[in-house]
């Protein structure tokens, strides 16, 4: 078979590995190819580990449980890894892998498949699940009559397409003849208990189908090598760091309060790569908690049980419970507790619920929808009703190549007003209010889907309006530290030049030094007609297209609901106008860039 005809379906390689192999060998002549072929064969024979390198599925199928995960953050991988460890303890042979590294050619050989997958954006598969998701939906997908499977879907019920990717996998596997071990398990943001129950249930369901003759977990997991060197500080065990700076970087006349926050990681040993996020645990505002307690007529010192801990109600609401983000289940529950005709009507309409939760918090439910007389909502029932507090993720705005043990964030203070009452975002208000020396509990959340090119000479195009510019500040610090010679281009936008040009002097210095090749800005309200970054992209379309043809990597960070979609449409228009592509071919072009890791998004 010719190398140019090679695909993951006809080799033991995944598609990303195939593409990398093609790229590495494209410039070799026949003599060089022959030498490389001989060298690799000799290396493989010398290792004496050919049997060890064979896919786990080459073992008798009934002996192996394959566990695949697809997740934008590390939650899915953590659930899958914990399941693999439990399966090992029960004597099972396990193949654990990211969906992005899994060779779909193996699928028809599987007999036991357990999937953990999240949903990203508006019902979209996370980056590492896209290829498998597409394959299962295609005509190439085989019949899977010998397969037993189970799917754990991760999602956030405050979004319309809750757990959609998991639903897609479940439906498609069933349509291909596979048999479900359990009904689809849908997990909200407080997924820990449901995931733990799934672990127990699915291993019980697997037991009659497998012989426990193996006792080794085969980790076909690109992240497994990294696990050994990870910091002891995690989401479950965060590091208590010190706030060094929380400085407003928008002007006095701006209607936006954006903070530059610097945090000292001290001697924690925490390491991050540019593109990663910082998880921030926060406490709810005490004044907000007092308002809720007064509105419900509940005593602050009432004893409640949260998990295995007995604490007073006020402490539980400050430290343990989500108060600033509503979700559909809570709106529906409160509608029933209040018997409010208005809220009941809202709770029955998905779009009305979606709009309602964007502009209301739990305190608004308490203030505006009084409980009916027989609601009987006591302190313990209240904490059961509210879902657990979860950390917020912020794109890291620094490189440790420059700031060493510090980590920098760009935080927009979330502010809203409802019936004259100001409401603030939980984490953003916590960070904005933090004084020098204050403690904040943090951990690093890796994002392998938002990485600079391995070759510093590769050009990069960075599109980051508003606080979406944060990771590109980190990118530039890293590129300077690398001595990168590749061109770099930033698109930035915000309402006003004088008030909202985040990190203006830094960008100007990068331009002056030649580290940043060019910058195009869009200040939407500095003229009669609004101008956004997507307009600048179209204006510079010919040059942008040439950069892409020269191998540039393309990055987008910021708002997923509107900005990222508008920017994508602008990029498609550029490909049509300046690349001469049809609309369908333009979509395929950017899909190819994405699969080659040349088109990456960090959107939220």
Curated annotation (Swiss-Prot):
Biochemical pathway = Sulfur metabolism; hydrogen sulfide biosynthesis; hydrogen sulfide from sulfite (NADPH route): step 1/1
Subunit-structure text: Alpha(8)-beta(8). The alpha component is a flavoprotein, the beta component is a hemoprotein.
For this UniProt entry, the molecular function terms from Gene Ontology, in alphabetical order, are: flavin adenine dinucleotide binding; FMN binding; sulfite reductase (NADPH) activity
The Flavodoxin-like domain, residue ranges = 65-203
- Cofactors (names): FAD; FMN
- Which source organism does the UniProt entry give? Shewanella sp. (strain ANA-3)
Q: Report the protein's function.
A: Component of the sulfite reductase complex that catalyzes the 6-electron reduction of sulfite to sulfide. This is one of several activities required for the biosynthesis of L-cysteine from sulfate. The flavoprotein component catalyzes the electron flow from NADPH -> FAD -> FMN to the hemoprotein component.
Report the Pfam families cross-referenced here: FAD_binding_1, Flavodoxin_1, NAD_binding_1
Query: What is the designated name of this protein?
Result: Sulfite reductase [NADPH] flavoprotein alpha-component
Catalytic activity annotation? hydrogen sulfide + 3 NADP(+) + 3 H2O = sulfite + 3 NADPH + 4 H(+)
Q: What is one GO cellular-component annotation here?
A: cytosol
List the InterPro entries.
CysJ (IPR010199), CysJ-like_FAD-binding (IPR003097), CysJ_Proteobact (IPR029758), FAD-bd_FR_type (IPR017927), Flavdoxin-like (IPR001094), Flavodoxin/NO_synth (IPR008254), Flavoprot_Pyr_Nucl_cyt_Rdtase (IPR001709), Flavoprotein-like_sf (IPR029039)
**Which Enzyme Commission number(s) are on file for it?**
1.8.1.2
Primary gene name: cysJ
Q: Relay the cofactor remark from the entry.
A: Binds 1 FAD per subunit.
The record's comment on protein family reads: Belongs to the NADPH-dependent sulphite reductase flavoprotein subunit CysJ family.
UniProt-listed CDD domains: SiR (cd06199)
Q: What class of enzyme is it?
A: oxidoreductase
Q: Which residues form the FAD-binding FR-type domain?
A: 236-453
């Amino acid at each position: 078979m010719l190398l140019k005809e090679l695909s993951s379906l006809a080799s033991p390689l995944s598609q990303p590995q195939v593409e990398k192999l093609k790229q590495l060998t494209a410039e070799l002549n026949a003599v060089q190819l022959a030498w490389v072929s001989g060298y690799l064969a000799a290396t493989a024979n010398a290792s004496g580990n050919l049997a060890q390198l064979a896919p786990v599925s080459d073992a008798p199928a009934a002996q192996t449980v394959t566990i695949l995960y697809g997740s934008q953050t590390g939650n899915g991988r953590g659930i899958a890894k914990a399941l693999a460890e439990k399966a090992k303890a029960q004597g099972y042979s396990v193949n654990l892998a990211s969906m992005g590294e899994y060779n779909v050619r193996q699928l028809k050989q599987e007999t036991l498949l357990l999937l953990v997958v999240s949903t990203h954006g508006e019902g979209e598969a996370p980056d590492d699940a896209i290829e498998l998701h597409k394959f299962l939906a295609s005509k190439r997908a085989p019949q899977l009559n010998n397969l037993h499977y189970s799917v754990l879907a991760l999602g956030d019920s405050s979004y319309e397409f809750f757990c959609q990717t998991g639903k897609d996998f479940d439906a498609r596997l069933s349509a291909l003849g596979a048999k479900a071990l359990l009904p689809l398990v849908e997990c909200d943001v407080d997924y820990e208990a449901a995931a733990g129950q799934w672990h127990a249930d699915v291993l019980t369901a697997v037991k009659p189908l497998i012989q426990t003759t193996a006792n080794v977990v085969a980790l076909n997991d690109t992240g497994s090598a990294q696990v050994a060197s990870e910091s002891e500080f995690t989401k479950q065990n965060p590091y208590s760091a010190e706030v060094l700076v929380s400085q407003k970087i928008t002007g006095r006349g701006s209607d936006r309060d954006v903070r530059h926050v610097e945090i000292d990681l001290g001697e924690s040993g925490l390491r991050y790569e540019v593109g990663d996020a910082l998880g921030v645990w926060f406490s709810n505002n005490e004044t907000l908690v007092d308002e809720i307690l007064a509105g419900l007529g509940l005593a602050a010192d009432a004893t409640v049980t949260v998990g295995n801990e007995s604490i007073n109600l006020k402490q539980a609401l400050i430290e343990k419970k989500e108060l600033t983000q509503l979700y559909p289940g809570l709106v529906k529950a409160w509608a029933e507790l209040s018997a409010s005709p208005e809220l009941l009507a809202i709770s029955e309409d998905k779009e009305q619920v979606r709009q309602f939760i964007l502009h209301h918090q739990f305190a608004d439910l308490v203030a505006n929808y009084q409980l009916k007389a027989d609601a009987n909502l006591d302190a313990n029932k209240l904490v059961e009703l509210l879902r657990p507090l979860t950390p917020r993720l912020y794109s890291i705005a620094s490189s440790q190549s420059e700031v060493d043990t510090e980590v920098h964030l760009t935080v927009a203070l979330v502010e809203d007003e409802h019936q004259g009452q100001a409401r603030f975002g939980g984490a953003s208000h916590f960070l904005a209010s933090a004084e020098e020396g204050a403690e904040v509990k943090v951990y690093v959340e890796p994002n392998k889907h938002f990485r600079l090119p391995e070759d510093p000479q590769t050009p990069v195009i960075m599109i980051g309006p508003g606080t979406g510019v944060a990771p590109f500040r980190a990118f530039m610090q890293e590129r300077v530290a690398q001595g990168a010679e590749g061109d770099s281009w930033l698109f930035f936008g915000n309402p006003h030049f004088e008030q909202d040009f985040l990190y203006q002097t830094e960008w100007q210095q990068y331009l002056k030094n030649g580290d940043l090749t060019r910058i195009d800005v869009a200040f939407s309200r500095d003229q009669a007609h609004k101008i956004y970054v997507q307009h600048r992209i179209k204006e510079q379309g010919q040059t942008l297209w040439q950069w892409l043809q020269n191998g540039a990597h393309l990055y987008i960070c910021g708002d997923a609901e509107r900005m990222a979609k508008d920017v994508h449409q602008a990029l498609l228009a550029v490909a049509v106008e300046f690349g001469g592509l049809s609309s369908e071919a333009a979509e395929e072009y950017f899909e190819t860039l994405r699969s080659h890791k040349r088109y990456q998004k960090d959107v939220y």
